[in-house]
Every structure is written in structure tokens, then in C-alpha cells.
């Protein structure tokens, strides 16, 4: 039997040993069991309910310069919601023309240089849904009759007609297409403008003009096709997009619109020959071609230049040496005391395509003298058209200048390009042998411009290129505004807007520009924008 003393002694001994040895943690074995019930499945359903709010529809009814607005609020529509759809009913004018000689096709000789170019400035992305019924465009006007298809009201106006020979053209202005009746397409040029300002177009915009009112969109790409039908597509949907580059500020805007056109027919206006512009430019572009593309006779050319001289214009720009122009244009110009900006037109064949023209020019100068020439222009927008490289053009300018100098010509030489060509290729003005910089700025192709701002646009382009090229010696070798064609941004072609634009250009540039052109050039195809034939302005000068 253990005595109490022995038990206590043993307990104390164990306590001592326990305190002396380390205490190890208890080992635990944890088993993780993944369970999935096979008999009790619970599924959580998550749902989102979106409230659909129908906004009112705003309807614009445009008649000439008057716009009627109606807000449509059918049953179930929230009258306080923002409208998202605009229906614009455009009531355009109907015009007919009777002429003594109107060609049935648009002809363009392969040797005839195009004197008009076009470019794109800040691009606009637009989705267009257009419903059109029997819409066509024809050139020339003898009487304007505005018919309101949706009402019983009719309005007519009868300006004095000017008889012209034209080619029929059908233009879908809403979607930027041109359906042209004829077999030949013009060399429509597209280039980018170094615009100094931008325009943000808002959704559901309608613009009314004096001649024709259209709710249209900026075409950034378009197609040209032959057509003999007077009506165009119905319920046509088109979406176009384009990107442009410029070292100046640029803007891209998008807009959507829905346009409904009913029984609309428009025409290019040609009103009375009474002066509407208060002053004349120092120079005007002239082409010695008949409306069908054939060459004018010496008598016809002499009559044209006599008219130009009577308007107080002392210089003309001629784009090429074809049509036997050295025997028709030059003699008439010498007789009338008109100076010529003689062009050497570079074609798609490259810079060597002007070699024969250079030879002909030298032969004329050595025989008749050089006094009739104001200056010589080597190429017109050849860089922009992609018909030659900058280095090739620079070399050709040097070669031509050397040959002309050896032949006795001591005048100036230049080339003519849209402003963006010099902006993208400053060597063309900084490292070439041109005596001044020639630019072709056109406000129509800048969607942020308009007829009212055409003058400031042209002046801004001159100042821009002065900075790019490091010289103040920049001259406007071609500019103008169309009287007919497709709306491009803030630019609405019409006779009234053409007069406004040209007057503003002359005011801003102190008359020192070359205006395109003497007559409407019906020998050209209308081009993608439907404007190429309608730059003629001689009748509006005093």
C-alpha cells in the first residue's frame, strides 16, 4: 500500500518532468469532404426587367424656307421622353428644260484634262434610312415649279431662263449616289482638306434653301453608274464611312436620320444673266470644249474670250494644250490682251505624259513670243490623283523649267494641288523649282464650311499653306462653288449659294483668285457628288 507521502512524491516528480520537457502540438487529421446532393437540387434564377419607354416622334415638314414641326404622341407614348426619331418630309422643286441642243450622253475625251477636283475634310459617319419616290435631277432650268405632294397647295416661280445644253443626270442626294445618264464618267478626284474648323452635326437636322430643300447626309463614299431611268431607288438604306488625315484639327461626328421624300424632282438652276456678283475676279478657268466634248472653233473661242474680257477679267486658266488651243485660245487672248495661265496636264500615265505638250509650247513661244503667258503650271492635282510621285513631279518641274528657259521663257512656273498635298508633302513646295505655290481650295468639300464661310475658308487654306511652305507667296489657282449637286455637310449647292460663296471669296481674297469656271462644263460627267458640271459663273459677274 502506497503511503500518502510516496504518492505525493511521485506526483511532484511527474510535474517536474513535464515542465522540463517541450510540449508538442497535438496532431490533427482534417478530412475535407466535397459533397453534392443528388436528391435536393436548388437553382437560383436571376432576372432583370427593363422598362421600355416609347418617346414621341417629331415630324418636320419643310416647304421652301418654311419648316412645320409636329410632335406625334400616339397611345402608350411617354410625352416627356426625349424623341429619338425624326421623320423629315422634304418637298423639293420640279423643273423642266427645253433647249435647242441638248446632248443625250455625257462625253469625255480621254485627252481632256479635268479642271475640277474634290476633296474630303473632317469625315462624318452617317447611317441613312431613305425612302424615295420618283426623284431625279436634270441640268438646266427654264421654269421652277414647286409642288407640294402632301397638300393641295402649289407655289411657282419663273425666273428668266438661260438656254443651255446639258446632259441629263439623276442624283440620289439622300444616300450620296449619282446615277448618271451617259457612257463616260468624269475623273472625279477626292482629296482631304486641311480644315481650320470642324462641325458637329446633330441628329435630326433639316436645312432649307431658296432653290431646293433637302435633308441629306455627307457622302464619304459613293458610286457612279449609268442609268436611263428618271426614278431612283425606293426604301434604300446606305451606310458610308471614311477616314481622313490632317495635321490640323479634325473631328468625326456621327448622325442618323430618316428621310422621306415624296414625288420630288430637282434640277440645276440657271437663272437670268443679270449680274448678281458685285465684282469680278482677276482670273477665271476656261475650257475650249463644247457641251458634247468636241473642240470649239476659233470663232467660238474668240466669242467666249470677248465675253470674259467684257466682264473685266484679264486672265484665264487653261488646263492643257489639246483641242488645238495654241491656234484658237492663244490668238484670241493676244488680240484681247488677256494673259494665260497655261497648263501642262499630267495624266495617269505619269509625268512624261506632258512631253508633247512641252514641245508644242516651246514651238509656239519661239514662233510667237512668250508675252501672252502669265505663268506655266506643270500638272493639276497629279499628286492628289496618285498619277505621279512627289520626287517625279519635282524632277519634271526642274526639267520643264530648264527647257523653257533655254527656249527664251523667263516667266514663272508652278504646279497646282489641293492644300493637303502640300501639307502632306512639304518637299513639293520647299525643295522644288516652283516660283510660287499654287493651291486649289474648295469650301464645298469641307463639311464644316458653307456658302457664307467660303471666303474665310479659302483665306484660311492660304494661310495654312503659307505656314507649311514657309513662304507668303501662295496663290489660289482654282476655287469656286457649285450651283447644283448633293449637299455636303453645311454646303448646299444652289445658284443663290454659288453667288453668295463666290462673292465672299472675292471679298476675302481681294479678287486675286482664279474662279472655276466660265461656263457649266457639261462635257464632264457629274461626278460622285453631282457637282462637276455646275461651276459656271460668268453670267453673274457685272
Swiss-Prot record:
Residues 98-118, 150-168, 209-276 have a biased composition (Low complexity). Keywords: Cell wall, Cell wall biogenesis/degradation, Glycosidase, Hydrolase, Secreted, Signal. SUPFAM superfamilies: (Trans)glycosidases (SSF51445). Present with 22600 molecules/cell in log phase SD medium. Residues 138-149, 182-208 have a biased composition (Polar residues). Residues 1-20 form the signal peptide. GO terms for cellular component: cell periphery; cell surface; extracellular region; fungal-type cell wall. GO terms for biological process: carbohydrate metabolic process; cell wall organization. Its EC number is 3.2.1.-. It is an enzyme of class 3 (hydrolase). Belongs to the glycosyl hydrolase 17 family. Involved in cell separation. The gene is SCW11. This is Probable family 17 glucosidase SCW11.
